[in-house]
Amino acid sequence: MTPLDDPFRTVGCELAKIPTDVKVIFVDMHAEATSEKMAMGWHLDGKVSVVVGTHTHVATADSRVLPGGTAYITDVGMTGPHDGVIGMDKRGVLQRFLDSMPARFVVAEGDIQMNTVLIDVDESTGHARSIERLNFRLD
């Protein structure tokens, strides 16, 4: 999908609108490409408290605090059915891959997973101290 505007230029304009006394800034980078999310993390390192990637529904294992004090993860994951493909019933998704025909996806049933992160931020500086992935399975 082609963006309406370059997110790397746009984020600078949006950050400039935030009052200078605001120290804790959270950015949700909703994108398909992991490389774009990683580049945004580096671009914003030291300028924001947190960059969390979303969209793919698959939690990544690369959470860390970057050198400038920005907590980062490429994709936090999702909250939804565990035994499916990104929350959808696996049979329909597999059939679409196997026959290359459009198919309506149905939400999977069963156990629920919740992926999230716990981030500790110094409120006086806005720098992250830590980021921890948390994954829960709910029956």
Question: Where do the model's predicted regions map?
Answer:
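Short, small-residue-enriched loops and turns at beta-alpha junctions
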Residues: M1-T2, A33-S35
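Binuclear metal-dependent hydrolase catalytic cores centered on His/Asp/Glu-rich metal-binding motifs
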Residues: M1-V24
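Short beta-strand/loop segments at the ligand-binding rim of alpha/beta enzyme cores
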Residues: T20-M29, K47-V51
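Conserved beta-sheet core of the metallophosphoesterase superfamily
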Residues: T34-V107
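A short C-terminal boundary segment appended to hydrolase-like catalytic domains
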Residues: V93-D139
